[in-house]
């Protein structure tokens, strides 16, 4: 046999031996793993504690398997990954099994404790049954003691009530004379609390004319001209009609939308109908008091904003000239906290002087304010200082609002105090500048600084306040305009208040 054939046979045998060795190692590894899994299942089913020892004792199985893979460089990476996943899942299962095992032990322990407690409670119940009669007797004694105490307290309370009743009877005998005085004092207060029913405006024109003629007779005898701030919806020409319906001899109105900067101008038809209605119902145009827009603030230190207010201000005055109205009332304004009151007063007076030059004959009327923060006009001195800086003194005046006056700190609740306030006004401002009155009751207290109007007889002011206005020399032949809330929503409240005030004035005379 040749030499090279022998070498080939030798190498072939060696190669076959190596293959058999590798196969045997792999088979043994898998067989060991299979056995390990079976043992793990058996051990895990018995108790989780034995499984701990199993994991520690059989780590060499996986190390052998991995070493074989590394030595032979086989492409079994997936097998290694599966091995790692098996270990992780086994650990999770082990933790779950431990938790379950602990819960089982706790439940067994608790069941033992419950059994022991039941046994103890049975013994206690036997003892308690014997003692229940003693406890009931003890509780009955306590109840009897409490009942006795309650009886004593009721007797004491009855004695106290009898003593109080005796003292009240004695006080009634003593205070008979004082009661009559208190009744006289509280007459005005009871009038405030009574629910007043306001009659509606008559539907027939004849009845309206009859009521209107009665008011004219009152006005002629007293020289007091009452009216209200009435609606001008649908056009200024409707204002005289609405004033006639409430029996007003004077009235106030807005010549345009009081909450907008721009409004359409008056048409020739508006002006014509307004003049015709004033003649029809015998209105004196000297007793008409238009009210300026709420947006106007001539005291504003900002030049642009003050100019915007001024243009609206002058537009109102020119509308008064178109309607041949002689008075125009407005709120002086506020410093807005951006300048001093002196500077605000100067801004107001400069705007009025400028408006006088651009218009002809309308008298600009300053309304006193309630004393809100930064407002100008709450003090008589403010009004005096504005008037002192006006060039044309014949075209400036003042409107006193009773609610604002009271809220600003001037006490006008009694006849005597109102007289003092008006004398003070005469000395500081001069009563010749008093051109109009806004007649309102006040919801707010004296000196509160709050502008809160109320219906006549329902606020903080007294009937003496309104009697003084109806009879005092300071308020003759000027427009006295109600600005009370229209609680009836049809202005019939103004008709009632006008008639009420005139009748009160007639009784005083």
From Swiss-Prot:
EC number(s) given by UniProt: 3.1.21.-
Gene Ontology terms describing biological process: base-excision repair
InterPro entries: AP_endonuc_2, AP_endonuc_F2_Zn_BS, Xyl_isomerase-like_sf, Xyl_isomerase-like_TIM-brl
Compartments where located: Mitochondrion
Post-translational modification: May be proteolytically cleaved.
Region (Disordered) residue spans: 144-188
Cofactor: Zn(2+); Mn(2+)
A Pfam family per the record: AP_endonuc_2
Residue numbers binding Zn(2+) 2: 367, 401, 438, 483
One annotated Gene Ontology cellular component of this protein: mitochondrion
Phenotype reported upon loss of the gene: Normal asexual blood stage development. Normal transmission from the host blood to the mosquito vector with no defect in oocyst development. Salivary gland sporozoites are normal and are able to infect C57BL/6 mice. Sporozoites can infect host liver and develop into merozoites. No defect in the integrity of mitochondrial DNA.
Bias (Basic and acidic residues) ranges: 152-164, 175-188
Keywords: DNA damage, DNA repair, Endonuclease, Hydrolase, Manganese, Metal-binding, Mitochondrion, Nuclease, Signal, Zinc
Positions bound to Mn(2+): 404, 451, 453
Binding site for Zn(2+) 3: 404, 451, 453
Signal peptide region: 1-24
SMART domains: AP2Ec
Transmembrane segments: none
Gene Ontology molecular function: any one: DNA-(apurinic or apyrimidinic site) endonuclease activity
Cofactor note: Binds 2 Zn(2+) and 1 Mn(2+) ions.
Entry binding sites for Zn(2+) 1: 291, 331, 367
Family according to the record: Belongs to the AP endonuclease 2 family.
PANTHER family: APURINIC-APYRIMIDINIC ENDONUCLEASE, ENDONUCLEASE IV ENDODEOXYRIBONUCLEASE IV
Known role: Plays a role in mitochondrial DNA base excision repair (BER) pathway induced by oxidative stress. Has apurinic/apyrimidinic (AP) endonuclease activity towards double-stranded DNA (dsDNA) with a preference for C as opposite base. Has 3'-phosphatase activity; removes 3'-phosphate from blunt-end, recessed, and gapped DNA templates and thus, removes 3'-blocks for DNA polymerase activity during BER. Lacks 3'-5' exonuclease activity and does not cleave damaged bases by nucleotide incision repair (NIR).
Protein name in UniProt: Apurinic-apyrimidinic endonuclease 1
Organism field: Plasmodium berghei (strain Anka)
Gene name in the database record: APN1
């Amino acid at each position: 046999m040749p030499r090279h054939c022998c070498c080939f046979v030798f190498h072939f045998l060696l190669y076959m031996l190596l293959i058999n060795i590798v196969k045997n190692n792999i088979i043994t590894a898998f067989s060991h793993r299979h056995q390990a899994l079976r043992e793990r299942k058996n051990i895990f089913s018995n108790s989780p504690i034995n499984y701990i020892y199993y994991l520690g004792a059989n780590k060499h199985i996986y190390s052998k398997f991995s070493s074989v893979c590394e030595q032979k460089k086989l492409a079994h990476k997936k097998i290694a990954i599966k091995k790692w996943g098996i270990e992780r899942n086994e650990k999770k299962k082990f933790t779950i099994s431990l938790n379950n095992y602990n819960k089982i032990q706790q439940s067994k322990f608790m069941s033992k404790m419950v059994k022991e407690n039941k046994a103890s409670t049975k013994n206690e119940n036997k003892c308690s049954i014997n003692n229940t009669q003693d406890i009931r007797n003890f509780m009955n004694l306590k109840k009897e003691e409490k009942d006795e105490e309650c009886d004593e307290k009721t007797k004491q309370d009855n004695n106290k009530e009898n003593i109080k009743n005796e003292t009240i009877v004695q006080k009634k005998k003593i205070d008979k004379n004082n009661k009559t005085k208190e009744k006289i004092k509280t007459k005005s207060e009871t009038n405030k609390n009574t629910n007043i029913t306001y009659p509606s405006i008559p539907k027939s024109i004849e009845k309206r004319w009859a009521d209107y003629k009665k008011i004219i007779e009152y006005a002629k005898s007293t020289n007091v001209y009452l009216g209200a701030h009435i609606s001008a919806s649908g056009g200024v020409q409707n204002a005289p009609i609405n004033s006639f319906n409430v029996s007003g001899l004077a009235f106030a109105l807005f010549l345009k939308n009081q909450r907008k900067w721009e409004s359409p101008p008056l048409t020739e038809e508006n002006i014509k109908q307004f003049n015709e209605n004033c003649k029809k119902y015998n209105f004196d145009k000297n007793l008409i008091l238009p009210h300026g827009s709420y947006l106007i603030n001539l005291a504003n230190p900002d030049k642009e904003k003050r100019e915007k207010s001024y243009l609206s201000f002058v537009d109102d005055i020119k509308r008064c000239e178109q309607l041949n109205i002689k008075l125009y009332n407005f709120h002086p304004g506020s410093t807005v906290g951006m300048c001093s009151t002196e500077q605000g007063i100067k801004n107001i007076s400069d705007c009025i002087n400028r408006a006088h030059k651009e218009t002809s004959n309308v008298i600009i009327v300053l309304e006193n304010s309630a004393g809100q923060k930064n407002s100008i006009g709450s003090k008589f001195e403010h009004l005096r200082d504005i008037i002192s800086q006006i060039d044309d003194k014949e075209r400036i005046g003042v409107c006193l609002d009773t609610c604002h006056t009271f809220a600003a700190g001037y006490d006008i609740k009694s006849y005597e105090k109102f007289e003092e306030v008006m004398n003070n006004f005469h000395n500081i401002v001069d009563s010749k500048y008093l051109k109009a009155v806004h007649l309102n009751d006040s919801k707010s207290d004296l000196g509160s600084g709050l502008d809160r109007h109320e219906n006549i007889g329902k606020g903080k002011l007294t009937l003496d306040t309104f009697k003084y206005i109806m009879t005092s020399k300071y308020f003759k032949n000027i427009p006295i305009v109600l600005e009370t809330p229209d609680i009836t929503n049809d202005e019939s409240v103004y008709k009632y208040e006008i008639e009420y005030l005139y009748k009160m004035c007639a009784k005083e005379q």
